[in-house]
């Protein structure tokens, strides 16, 4: 890429980052926005269906139903449920790995840095164990056991984690989730052609997935991460490109599998690694 796409493509509140992107000799997602500015009107409205080999079907005033008979409401809800199930699956995958990492650390009797977070979860789950590592393993097992329940068996930790009045409303609405992994499978299956045409029913499934994703994929992932990474502390810190310190080796890590970073957290402070950094020109501490 020899020139910038346009003067507004990379506009950002972070001016150093904006200038950096504008001068890159390659294409970034910021530049590709320009080429994708014209959107498919059917796709934007959610009334395009590509679920079966008879499609794609698009809903218009002259053709209000797809070949399978689904109307706009069904197609929109079906597309939405598939997207929600897919996203939920990603987050449940993360909390599963995080719980397994906590369990592995407990079994090795090392790597527990946030005992306060561990004690908080143990109290919530009503786990009483003197040994910290046994306590951590049982906390991890409680999370994993819930994830692996069948769809028709409600997860046990939801009530312990949720705000009580809200839990009562979920119970009245019939949207308490079963096993989180099974709920993802159930949601995908429900989207199949001719299996369900009730948009309200599919949207209720989205709410169930939202509960399991929020409590397990988000809240519990963070609390389990605190056990192995240590509990976070509020502090003032630079953001954007200002985090880069030219006196040191700068490594940027991104992703959701934070508990997998614990190895790097330890390894990068070892003497042989710090010596290599000094040899590369990093400032000695």
PLM-predicted stretches and their roles:
Residues 2-285:
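Metallocofactor- and cofactor-centric catalytic cores in central/energy metabolism, strongly enriched
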């Amino acid at each position: 890429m020899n020139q910038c796409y346009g003067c507004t493509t990379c506009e950002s509140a972070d001016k150093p980052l904006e200038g950096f992107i504008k001068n890159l000799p390659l294409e970034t997602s910021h530049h590709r926005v320009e080429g994708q500015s014209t959107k498919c009107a059917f796709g934007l409205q959610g009334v395009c269906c590509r679920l079966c080999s008879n499609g794609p079907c698009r809903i218009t005033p002259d053709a209000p139903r797809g070949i399978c008979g689904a109307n706009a409401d069904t197609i929109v809800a079906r597309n939405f449920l598939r997207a929600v199930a897919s996203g939920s699956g990603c987050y449940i995958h993360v909390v599963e790995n995080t719980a397994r990492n906590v369990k592995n650390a407990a079994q090795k009797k090392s790597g527990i840095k946030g005992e306060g977070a561990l004690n908080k979860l143990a109290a919530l789950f009503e786990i009483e164990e003197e040994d910290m590592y046994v306590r951590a393993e049982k906390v991890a097992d409680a999370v994993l056991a819930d994830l692996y329940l069948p769809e028709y068996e409600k997860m046990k930790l939801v009530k312990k984690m949720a705000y009580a009045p809200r839990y009562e409303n979920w119970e009245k609405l019939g949207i308490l989730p079963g096993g989180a992994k099974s709920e993802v499978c159930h949601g995908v299956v429900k989207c199949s052609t001719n299996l369900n045409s009730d948009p309200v029913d599919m949207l209720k499934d989205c709410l169930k997935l939202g509960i399991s994703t929020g409590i397990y994929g988000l809240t519990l992932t963070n609390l389990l991460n605190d056990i192995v990474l240590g509990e976070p502390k509020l502090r003032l810190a630079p953001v954007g490109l200002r985090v880069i310190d030219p006196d040191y080796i700068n490594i940027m890590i991104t992703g959701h599998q934070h508990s997998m970073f614990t190895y790097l957290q330890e390894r990068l402070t070892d003497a042989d690694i710090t010596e290599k950094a000094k040899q590369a020109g990093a400032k000695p501490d």
